[in-house]
Regions:
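Catalytic Walker B motif of ABC-type/P-loop ATPase nucleotide-binding domains
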Residues: 89-92
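Hydrophobic anchor residue at the start of the ABC signature
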Residues: 78
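A short, proline-enriched helix->beta-strand linker immediately N-terminal to the Walker B motif
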Residues: 83-87
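Conserved ABC ATPase signature
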Residues: 64-68, 72
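Catalytic "switch" loops of ABC-type ATPases
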Residues: 16-21, 127
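Conserved ABC ATPase "signature" region
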Residues: 31, 35, 42-60, 112
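Short coil-to-helix segment of the ABC ATPase nucleotide-binding domain corresponding to the Q-loop/switch region
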Residues: 24-31
Length: 188
């Protein structure tokens, strides 16, 4: 049982869907995980307010999920994910259902939060552009049975901006390299 608690304190998981509690405000949702863990009210509120501001939701703290766009709800979920302070974040296609513009914005928000807090992030995505832009390495998996077929180092420095990277020739070279690995894996 103790090992489960240790694991729960070490890893935070962010879903593709926001999974917000509809009866809680943006602030209430952002501090939910820390509340469950027993963090003092003042401390969890301050942390949640700081993160809501960082994800661009200052002024929406008292809004309920039904009043927020899908992108705003994902921002709340991102704030909730970081609020726990876990050293490892598992993110399963967190921006997959967003429109292209909102997705780019949230990718930059995530990079900014990472730059500030330096967490280990395992980011699952089917979007090669997202993988190349945000990662330090891209692990390419084969189709069934899933196995690692390539480990591609991404050599961009930090801090970085997704939109700025996508204009660089090296970005396109890495994208092509990852795409070639993926094609090879699909043909096996």
């Amino acid at each position: 049982m103790a090992s489960r608690r240790l694991l729960a304190a070490t890893i935070t998981y962010m879903l593709a869907r926001d999974a917000l509690a509809p009866w809680r405000t943006a602030l209430g949702n952002a501090e939910l995980g820390t509340e469950v863990r027993g963090v003092a009210a003042e401390k969890r509120r301050a942390r949640a307010l700081d993160l809501l501001e960082k994800v661009g939701l200052k002024g929406f703290e008292d809004a309920y999920p039904k009043a927020l766009s899908h992108g705003m709800r994902q921002r709340v979920a991102l704030a909730r994910t970081f609020s726990l302070g876990s050293p490892i974040l598992l993110m399963d296609e967190p921006f997959g259902a967003l429109d292209a513009q909102t997705k780019l914005q949230l990718e930059d928000v995530l990079l900014s939060l990472w730059q500030r807090e330096r967490r280990t992030v395992l980011f699952i995505t089917h979007d090669l552009s997202e993988a190349v832009s945000m990662s330090d390495r891209v692990i390419v998996m084969s189709s069934r049975p899933g196995r690692i077929i390539a480990d591609v180092p991404i050599t961009f420095g930090r801090p970085r901006s997704v939109r700025a990277l996508q204009k660089e020739a090296h970005y396109h070279e890495l994208y092509s390299q990852v795409w070639s690995c993926l094609e090879e894996g699909l043909s096996q």
